[in-house]
Every structure is written in C-alpha cells, then in structure tokens.
C-alpha cells in the first residue's frame, strides 16, 4: 500500500498482477529482484530485507542463492530472527541485521509471547546479528539498551522520515535508515 496504493499483501499477488501497478505515482513498474540487481550491478552497497511473512525459509534460501552470484557488497536484515540465524549458519561471511521494534507499543498483531520475545530481542543470543536496526521511537527500551551493551552490535535506526527525526536519532544511533525525504548535507 505504501508504494503502490493498493491494499493487498505481496504474497497474495502473482507477478503478472503486480506488473500492472506503478511505484509511488510514477510510470515505473514493480521490478523483479533480478532486474534490480542487474540495474544496480554492484555500484552501491545494498541492504536486502527478508520479509517475515509467508515462507521465510524458502524466501531466505532463494535470496541467498540469488545473491551468491551478485558482484556487489550487501548485507541482509529481517524481522524474522530465524532468517538472520539461517544466514549466520549458511552464509556467515554476510553481514546480518536484526530488525525489531516494540511490538506492544506499535500494536502489531501477534501472539503475546511472540511480541515479548521479539520486542525484547530474546533470540539474539542464537542469531548473533552484526547490527540491530530498531524503531527509533523506542530507542530507550531497556532490552534494546541492554542488548547494545552486552553484544555491542552496530546500532541502526529505522525509519527516519524527516530532518528533525534525523537530528534526534543521530544522538543515539550509528547508522540511519531513512525514507520519504532527503537529509540535509552536514556542514
């Protein structure tokens, strides 16, 4: 919905259906993953997110196979801890990131124990992510602060939507993931 304005899950659509939608009110269609990789062709580093909906294991394996022949630099991230663990076990040379948020405060529809485990990053001892990308709104959550101190991962904020949020996030986070604006250049 964010990029194309239709209210349907990507996993519910065929590519034949998706290619009729346009991205962000432009004339650009939704590209296949291989098309994106061909256009980028290693010119810039990539953050590749493995979505947690659907068959995370199959998606993770397919993404890894595609990226095996990619000539550029990339890291992977996912909200699904076992996708991160899969990369730890099968592609340990790839930088891995655990995406997370406070599932309770964000009112995400999950079972209470899933919210508890994911909000508190309780599987990080298994997945050992290189970085934690955490919702910047909840940067003071105890479990996030504790994980940063115990495991010393890179500290990443998502998703910053304006200059004011950026300036505030820079006080806490090492790396910023931003969307929907272009940050002002630093002097």
Regions found by a protein language model. Name each.
Residues 1-104, 125-129, 133-137:
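Metal-dependent phosphodiesterase/phospholipase catalytic core, i.e.
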Residues 28, 107-187:
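C-terminal active-site rim and adjoining tail of enzyme catalytic domains
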